Curated annotation (Swiss-Prot):
It is an enzyme of class 2 (transferase). This is Nicotinate-nucleotide--dimethylbenzimidazole phosphoribosyltransferase. GO terms for molecular function: nicotinate-nucleotide-dimethylbenzimidazole phosphoribosyltransferase activity. GO terms for biological process: cobalamin biosynthetic process. Keywords: Cobalamin biosynthesis, Glycosyltransferase, Transferase. It catalyses: 5,6-dimethylbenzimidazole + nicotinate beta-D-ribonucleotide = alpha-ribazole 5'-phosphate + nicotinate + H(+).
């Protein structure tokens, strides 16, 4: 796979289709623009797919699972073994994302991109780069080649889903320590002070929280990631799950399929992808504003506004699955509402 050529081949939205969708929206039996963001979503879907009547019936959340060497520094309240346990539990149907996708009419695709354990459960896709990243306060988290391999895993995952007829993708992750790596990546890419980017993750004491902030500062100071080179940032202070998800966002733009951000980790990956190619932003739909404090910095940098503010910080793709249902409503209203001709009434006219 020639990633560079694929990324260079990304194009923008189809403005002609978006204009046609706008015309239909303005002819539906409602005041002009009264469905707000729902109308924007439909236009975006059309601009991505080139379809005047877009469909999002086939939905999947991709969950990238990986361990992070930085957990050696006590940055998480959970032991590293939780990554493997939850990864396996995704196949048992009772995790948060299982419940959310079940009721959103969506599937999940679980990818082991770097879990520090042998994961042999049926249904889990093995794309393990290696068993967890290195401890980033002792050196780079991964090599540049490994970072590129992570992007490739995500791009390929999207292509395979597109080939199967999936037309809406969500992004999720599982990896103890990944709010630490995401904080480092996002702090470098946004210029946000580490103290304002780092949050409590899965839950930390005040002392552990202060330690987490210090660890992120030390990792950035040691590795000196180049803000102008997103792949350098990823390789030095990122994680395999972030790499895979960034690849998913790139893949969505390459293969023209809408993709939904979940929470903080997913947003960090989205930011990374947009820094690689700014056109990727056109293919991204935000879901919720994570309770992690750095989330607002990333959304500001992306110039995106979350649909929901529910103070969630579970991850796994749960916020994306929630947003699926809003996207569904956007499409249903566009496709199923009557027009002024149907209703035999005069259409609304724009105010001058």
């Amino acid at each position: 796979m020639n990633i560079e050529n694929l990324i260079k081949g990304i194009n923008g939205l189809d403005n002609k289709v978006m204009s046609k969708i706008q015309k239909r929206l303005d002819n539906l039996t409602k005041p002009l623009g009264s469905l707000g963001t729902l109308e924007d979503i439909v236009k975006q879907l059309g601009g991505i797919t080139g379809e005047v009547y877009p469909s999002v019936k086939n939905k999947t959340v991709i969950i990238m699972c990986a361990d992070n060497g930085i957990v050696e520094e006590n940055v998480s309240s959970c032991p590293k073994s939780v990554t493997a346990s939850v990864t396996r539990n995704f196949m048992k149907g009772f995790t948060g994302i299982n419940v959310f996708t079940r009721h959103a009419g969506a599937d999940i695709e679980v990818i082991d991109i770097g879990v520090d354990a042998d994961i042999n459960e049926e249904g889990i896709i093995n794309k393990k780069i290696r068993r967890g990243t290195s401890n980033m306060i002792k050196g780079a988290a991964m090599t540049r080649d490994e970072a590129l391999k992570g992007l490739e895993v995500g791009i390929e995952a999207v292509k395979e889903l597109k080939d199967k007829g999936v037309n809406l993708i969500g992004t999720g992750e599982m990896g103890v320590g990944n709010t630490t790596t995401s904080s480092a990546v996002a702090s470098v890419l946004t210029g946000c002070p580490v103290d304002e980017m780092v949050g409590i993750g899965s839950g930390l004491t005040k002392e552990a929280f202060r330690n987490k902030i210090q660890i992120v500062k030390e990792a950035i100071a040691l590795n000196k990631p180049n803000k102008e080179d997103p792949i350098d940032v990823l390789s030095k202070v990122g994680g395999f799950d972030i790499a895979g998800l960034a690849g998913c966002f790139l893949g969505a733009a390459i293969y023209r399929i809408p993709i939904v951000i979940d929470g903080f980790i997913s947003a960090s990956a989205a930011l990374l992808a947009v820094k690689i190619n700014p056109l990727v932003k056109n293919f991204i739909i935000p879901s919720h504003g994570s309770a992690e404090p750095g989330s607002k910095w990333i959304m500001k940098e992306l110039d995106l506004e979350p649909m929901l503010n529910l103070k969630m910080r579970l991850g796994e793709g749960t916020g994306a699955a929630l947003a699926f249902q809003i996207v569904d409503m956007a499409v249903f209203s566009y496709l199923e509402m009557g027009t002024f001709e149907n209703a035999e009434i005069e259409p609304y006219k724009p105010l001058k």
